[in-house]
Amino acid sequence: DNTVTATEDTPFVFTDADFGFADVDVTTQPEDTFGTVTTLVSTGKLELNGVEVTLGQNISHDDILAGLLTFTPLKDGNGVGYDSFQFTVNDGIADSLVPSTLTIDVTAVNDLPTATDNTVTATEDTALVFVLADFGFTDVETDQLQSITVTTLNSTGTLLLDGSAVTIGQTISQSDISAGALTFTPLANDNGAGYDSFAYTVNDGVADSLTSATMTIDVTAVNDLPTSSDNTVTATEDTPFVFTDADFGFADVD
C-alpha cells in the first residue's frame, strides 16, 4: 500500500515509484505490463491518456513512465484519504496475488473569492452607511469577507471613509465597514434610480477576487420644505387690492 499527495484542482501524474513493487527475481519493473486496476476511484477521475480507466484495465510501465496515468480530484475537492483505488503489479510473467491500495490525499489550496453586483438604496440628503451584507461575496471555503478594494470611483455623490474621500485602489477593511465608517452622501436635493455607482473587489484574507463587482446606489427622493420670501405689493387708495399667487414669495426645489 502507498499514499500519494495531490493538489486541489490540479491533475496528479503518477510515477512508477508511487506503486509498491517488489520481486525477488528482479530489481526493477519490467517494460511490459506493470499492473491491473482491481477497484476504481470513487470521487475523482483516474485517467490513462485522457480516457477514464476501467475496472480490470492493464496499465503498462511505459505508460506510467510517460506520465499518462493521472488522477484529478473534483473541483474544489480536498482532504486526507480523499480517494483510493486498488491494483496488482506484474513482473512480466504473473500478477501479484494480493491487491494493494493506493490512497490519494488532496492538499487544499485557497480558491479566489467572488464579488457580485449589488444595489443599495440611499435617501435624499442623508448619508448612507454601508454594512458588510451590502458587498456581494462568495467563497467555496466559506471564508468571511475581510476587505474590499475600490477599483473605480463614484462620479456624483461623496464616498467617505471616516470622513475622508475614498481613493481609487484604496483597501477598506471588514472592521471599518462593520464600524459604519464607510458612507455615501448624494448631492443636496439629488435623487434617482441608478444615481451613482462604484466598483470593488473582495478579499477572503488570502487573495482578492479576480474580477470587480459594481455597487449601484439608488437615491429615494424626499419632500423638501418650501421656502417663503418677503415681497411688497402696491395698492391704490380707496380701491380694493386683489392678491394673486405671484404676490407670495414661494420656492420649492421639488
Where is each model-derived feature located?
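Proline-enriched interdomain boundary motifs that mark the N-terminal boundary
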Residues: 1, 111-118, 224-230
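Short helix- or helix-capping micro-motifs
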Residues: 37
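Short intrinsically disordered, low-complexity coil segments enriched in acidic
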Residues: 1-8, 227, 251-254
